[in-house]
Amino acid sequence: MYRILLIVLILSYMVTTGSLAATPKKKPAPIGPAVAVVSVQDSFQIEPLSAGVFAAIAKPGGSATTNAIFVIGKEYVVAAGAHMTKEVINDLRRAIAARTTKPIRYFVLAHHHAGYTYVDFDFPTGQDVLMSWQTWKNIDSEVREPEYSSMFFNEGLTLKPGGVSVVLTNIGKGHTDGDIVVFIPEAEVLFASDLLYINSVGYMGNGYMTDWLLALDFLEQIDAKQIIPGYGPVGDSEDVYEFGQFFRDFLTEVLKYIERGDTLEETLANFDLPQYHQMDGYEQLIQLNLKRAYGDLSDNFLP
């Protein structure tokens, strides 16, 4: 299946939207050393990865709960992220404004967790928000109605903000249904959002376990030089492999309990992965993740 997704990525690179000249052209600022630029916002630590490509890493204890990315093209800016409260949106906009006067033409919503109407609904009026069709269904099903302009797609889409390509791929089921990853081929930078956690067990409460494993295989196949996870520092393909190894060990252990007929309650009482105790979020999230994995695997593997 990941081979099919890889083909989708290549095909999506061929489907482009044209650049719109919203501001006078200026020479892009030279890339500086990988240090944060001071700006009036508290959510993100900004790290330049390549000319015009920036990782927005969620600060510990800050308002942001997941990382983001933004790309400054010759004509406009593309930003991407998830779990966006009004404060986090404004902080990301401030971080971008500290580096360019070009407009944010598109914001890519990487995914949305159904039932959470305090996030992903406060983009400014007039902001174009791109998402997968599955994410749009989640947004559209909420009690709260979005006031921003939305566009959604099926498999893939490539944006051309000027001098760089921003390739969007709809992974389908993984962390949620309709996860989007963002690849900048010229910089070999990949934004994986919450499909990837580095040094963390992550949140799996809406995940699709076997599909998620296939998605991780797909991310490895891209072989990006720098990968922005949903949580943790900027990494590379080795970090995808390591998270995938944890994920496989986790699911293998869950299946052992299911196959011997243990109930969910018995599994929760006895489950343990001592070799991963040091990972961030283990104590807080492992049982929640276990409930989701037990239910998902039971539905798919039990006769």
Regions found by a protein language model. Name each.
Residues P30-I31, P48, Y76-V78, A82-K86, Q134-K256, ...:
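Metallo-beta-lactamase
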Residues G52, V71, G81, I96, ...:
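Divalent metal-coordination and catalytic microenvironments
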Residues K25-A36, Q221-D223, V234-P303:
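Accessory terminal helices/loops
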Residues S19-A22:
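Boundary at the C-terminal end of the N-terminal hydrophobic targeting segment
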Residues L5-T16:
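Bacterial N-terminal signal peptides
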Residues E47-R94, I180-I184, V189-A192:
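Conserved beta-strand hairpin/beta-sheet module of binuclear metal-dependent hydrolase folds
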Residues R94-K160:
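Active-site HxH/HxHxD metal-binding segment of metal-dependent hydrolases
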